[in-house]
């Protein structure tokens, strides 16, 4: 069965400009060889993939990166017209187009199983991936002062800044209720985020590396409450405390001493002083092809509202990339949080944030990972503790098998003797379990590079 659709193809914006006698003129590209971003539009949704083209004497070869592997493509071009096909299982997509000043219109024919269902794609376009020649000569430190904050993780929000791997960003967040460092309400509550930041070169199938350089308190108060979430309680205890109203509890933050105390303590808690440990409740990227925006109170493969107390200064996060540029968001600052976020929130406050980014190419992950000087930590996020426990254990086992070249039995021996667990979050739709192992127990030498 063959389905053919005609549609606009903005082929590869490989527009080359020359300036002569003060006048800008355009000409067709000298070569199509190189790396591209191939985007297929399906029912108004864009699916972007890394594509590599090599052209020699009119012959086109290359691949697209899809489902953790490179799918070959082949075709031909005369410099004005281009044709290539992608064989993906039972499905073959044949692309044709005419190159005119870097833009092309054409058609695609899908033969065999159609990966998009009963209808063919509505269109496709491609552009050259960023060239290393465009990379700044040295990593930069960039300041970003947020004006707007967002309550969803989405690919449709315009990036606030384009940054390169190696760059460092200094910015700030509002608290979970939308209150800033001057105690002004800037946005509705619900974990509003700073961002998104577009990371050049990051593509679906890659891993975004986020290194948290600094987290600093920037105001003197935080807010929590006086209730425990039902998910953490027995039915008897919950019934006994059914009249709990989750009243706000105000904390005073002393950044110089590094402690938090109650602003209006009860007699029994008048001496309570706890050391602050600033952390980010939310670090996330945009969801992938066909996915609706994800609210900032939720978590999953994208990261998001993970509320894990080790996402703090000195930690490195690894997040699967699902959109070009990754589209990184940060927010939901906590001065301190106990495991599980049992109050339904933590010591909620605004923060000054400094982070750096990097990209690991073609190293797909099932979900978020965290690393610090002492531990490797794999997060499991699911609807139940059982599900999250299985996700976390499997993810950590896969991590040490692949990066430290261990066999399954070797990983089982190591984890059976050394694995530790934390319950990171029980307050939201997904619960979080973190499986972790001390790095001192891992095989010596550098882990395998992606």
Feature map (PLM): residue ranges:
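Intrinsically disordered, low-complexity linker/loop segments enriched in Gly/Pro
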Residues: 217-312
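Bacterial N-terminal signal peptides
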Residues: 6-17
